[in-house]
């Protein structure tokens, strides 16, 4: 079974672990799932979503690649803007949903569902033009901070002011 970069930390925090999408993932901690649910709904919860697929597509053909494989006008995205969209097959049928973020004119980051990532990445690779490169970021952690106090947690713990960060926007921060 695969593990995320945070696996040892989950074990140290005595998480109850279970298989999900081929990964040994935490499903709850000692406080219990109900307490965790309420904490996240009232405050903020941090989730390890590193099992999801993460890819970087860059190069002169990157934009054309996304415009071919999704029905979205990815070219209209400004830099540091994300779009929830779908990955389509040759007939326009939906393969999976994903989030594509435009980082620069020719550089994109995408997050793909865990259960389908191998199939999705293979489809992407088979449609990649010669003037674009796809990197599967397998060893990178991915965290989701959720809840009404998420903005405050970012500010208090990392000094990040996300108050002006809009919906589906991206911000880089080095710690």
Regions found by a protein language model. Give the residues of each.
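Basic, glycine/lysine-rich polyanion-binding surfaces/domains
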Residues: 1-175
